[in-house]
């Protein structure tokens, strides 16, 4: 069945690339951020897809570098009164939903996500209304308003387990917004899943022909793939998983060379995990084609040192995340279900 909104035809204006900083400027902003974090009783929570220098700063200041599920856990449990979320807007909203008593700052509130943009709440509500017999499961990469409509929120790290659980209960599913991840989960579980047709602009660009050529060039390499990638790319993988699961796979696979099909921001932590292995970027452009994202989310790239310093220094409407209380309470229900379910998996 077609949906009311077609993300494939939507045009997402990319933000301008941040102005490069000199070595001296980087050193200046790094020290300024460290000082401001202490003064504000703040901690950094950074996603794997942010730039390496941002992840390094989060490490050095006692913050967190992780996938969206662990970011949510860390921020809710940390005693800091202020969370600086280096990521995209839905991550800041999720932090505010889980920690309403804390000040949530972002380097920019214009850091979007194509999956979030590709699932407008009005169209999604109409889609759900047309299928009232289905349990609504939405990916973490959605707005607070879409989460508020859901029965469950899920991340890629526990998606298969959750849908397998719901399928065992005989529940039919609406899955949104990522069509590739939805199809992967459906294939793994056999569940009755009706997918919204969104896609990540980064993972959607991986090309099978170019990947095949790279594989022929490096026949001893293992291929690691995020399930937001097209099915044909997933079918070529030696390991499929979330960001944290791909890092774990890099450690356990015997191969000394790894081709990685996800945002290249992950290379910072993956290379730390396997310093003796060679990491190669999976190609994003096919024969005669060009890439838009080129394996790095343009909105993640907005989380620069200068923007982080400005967020900590200025606060205010340009940097602080707010979620209306009634909306927050509704979105909290499926988020807590996710966290509780994830806790049962961890034992």
From Swiss-Prot:
Keyword Amino-acid biosynthesis: no
Its EC number(s): 2.5.1.72
Gene Ontology annotations for the cellular component aspect, listed alphabetically: cytosol
Binding site for [4Fe-4S] cluster: 113, 200, 297
Cofactor(s) needed by this chain: [4Fe-4S] cluster
The reaction(s) this protein catalyses: iminosuccinate + dihydroxyacetone phosphate = quinolinate + phosphate + 2 H2O + H(+)
Keywords: 4Fe-4S, Cytoplasm, Iron, Iron-sulfur, Metal-binding, Pyridine nucleotide biosynthesis, Transferase
InterPro entries for the chain: NadA (IPR003473), NadA_sf (IPR036094), Quinolinate_synth_A_type1 (IPR023513)
Enzyme class at the top of the EC tree: transferase
Positions bound to iminosuccinate: 47, 68, 139-141, 156, 226-228, 243
Compartments where located: Cytoplasm
Cofactor: record remark: Binds 1 [4Fe-4S] cluster per subunit.
Gene Ontology molecular-function annotations: 4 iron, 4 sulfur cluster binding; metal ion binding; quinolinate synthetase A activity
Any Pfam family the entry gives: NadA
GO terms classed as biological process: 'de novo' NAD biosynthetic process from L-aspartate
Pathway named in the protein's UniProt entry: Cofactor biosynthesis; NAD(+) biosynthesis; quinolinate from iminoaspartate: step 1/1
PANTHER family: QUINOLINATE SYNTHASE, CHLOROPLASTIC, QUINOLINATE SYNTHETASE A
Family stated for the protein in its record: Belongs to the quinolinate synthase family. Type 1 subfamily.
Protein's job: Catalyzes the condensation of iminoaspartate with dihydroxyacetone phosphate to form quinolinate.
This protein's name: Quinolinate synthase
Organism of provenance: Escherichia coli O9:H4 (strain HS)
Gene name for this UniProt entry: nadA
């Amino acid at each position: 069945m077609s949906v009311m909104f077609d993300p494939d035809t939507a045009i997402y204006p990319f933000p301008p690339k941040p102005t490069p900083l000199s070595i001296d400027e980087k050193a200046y902003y790094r020290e300024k951020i460290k000082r401001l974090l202490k003064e504000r009783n703040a901690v950094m929570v950074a996603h794997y897809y942010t730039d390496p220098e941002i992840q390094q700063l989060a490490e050095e200041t006692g913050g967190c570098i992780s996938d969206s599920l662990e970011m949510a856990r860390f921020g809710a449990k940390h005693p800091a009164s202020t969370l600086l979320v280096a990521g995209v807007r839905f991550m800041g909203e999720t932090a505010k939903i889980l920690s309403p008593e804390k000040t949530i700052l972002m380097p920019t509130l214009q850091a979007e996500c194509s999956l979030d943009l590709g699932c407008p709440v009005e169209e999604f509500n109409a889609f759900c209304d047309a299928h009232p017999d289905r349990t609504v499961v939405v990916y973490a990469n959605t707005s607070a308003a879409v989460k508020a409509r859901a029965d469950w929120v899920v991340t890629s790290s526990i998606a298969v387990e959750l849908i397998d659980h719901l399928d065992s209960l005989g529940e039919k599913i609406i899955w949104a917004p990522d069509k590739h991840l939805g199809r992967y989960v459906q294939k793994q579980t056999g569940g009755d899943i009706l997918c919204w047709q969104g896609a990540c602009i980064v993972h959607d660009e991986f090309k099978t022909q170019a990947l095949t050529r790279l594989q022929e060039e490096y026949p001893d390499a293992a291929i690691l793939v995020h399930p937001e990638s097209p099915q044909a790319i997933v079918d070529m993988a030696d390991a499929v998983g979330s960001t944290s699961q791909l890092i774990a796979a890099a450690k356990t696979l015997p191969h000394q060379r790894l081709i990685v099909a996800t945002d290249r921001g992950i290379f910072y932590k993956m290379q730390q995990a396997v310093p003796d292995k060679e990491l190669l970027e999976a190609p994003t452009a096919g024969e005669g084609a060009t890439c838009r994202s080129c394996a790095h989310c343009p909105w993640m790239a907005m989380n620069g040192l200068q923007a982080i310093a400005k967020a900590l220094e200025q606060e205010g409407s340009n940097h602080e995340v707010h979620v209306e209380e009634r909306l927050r309470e509704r979105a909290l229900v499926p988020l807590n279900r996710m966290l509780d379910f994830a806790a049962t998996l961890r034992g």
